[in-house]
Amino acid sequence: MSEDAAAKRRARQTVNNLVLALIASLGIMLAIILIVPRDDSNRIQSVDYQGIAAEAQASSGKQIVAPELPAGWWSNSARWSPKPADGVQNWYAGFVGPKNQYIGLTQAFGINPTWLAFQLKNSAKTGTQAVGNYTWDIYEATEPSDPPKTKDFMMVLNYNDHDTALIYGVAKPQDFVEIATAIQVKLMERTK
């Protein structure tokens, strides 16, 4: 065998070995991808907001509203703030719908105009929505965001002189009405 033929053979072996190594690496990578289990469940766990509301009500003596959610909805967060920095005790619960909608509920006790103005900053009253025996004020962002932010649309219910319920989020108006209806049912239970 001549030196030229041997050099060509060695050059072909290098290319062949490179291709074989690449194929083997891709095969191993594909096997790992297929073998490794993937968790496709929701990473955000459901929260027992009604249990947290019951504890908050027992410890505070306040009438905490924990509405029954429509089918497919669940709570991703709930908390009672008995001594917040702004001085307004409040109950918060976040709700997630079947199409990934989000509606937050803040129920505040002993509010003052400053607290309410802070909650409604960058919003303007655009109308009202009658829900059962209550009329909710609708506030929308003066400069809507794209994508929408959670407080670009809010419904506000003032009741008992200094108590307020706010619902806000990213959902269709009908979703807000459903949650407001569930809140109204709980508020009516309190007055019986």
For the regions a language model picked out, list residue spans one by one:
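Charge-rich, low-complexity N-terminal segments
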Residues: 1-77, 81
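A short, solvent-exposed beta-edge/loop patch
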Residues: 33, 126-192
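Short, solvent-exposed recognition patches
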Residues: 51-150
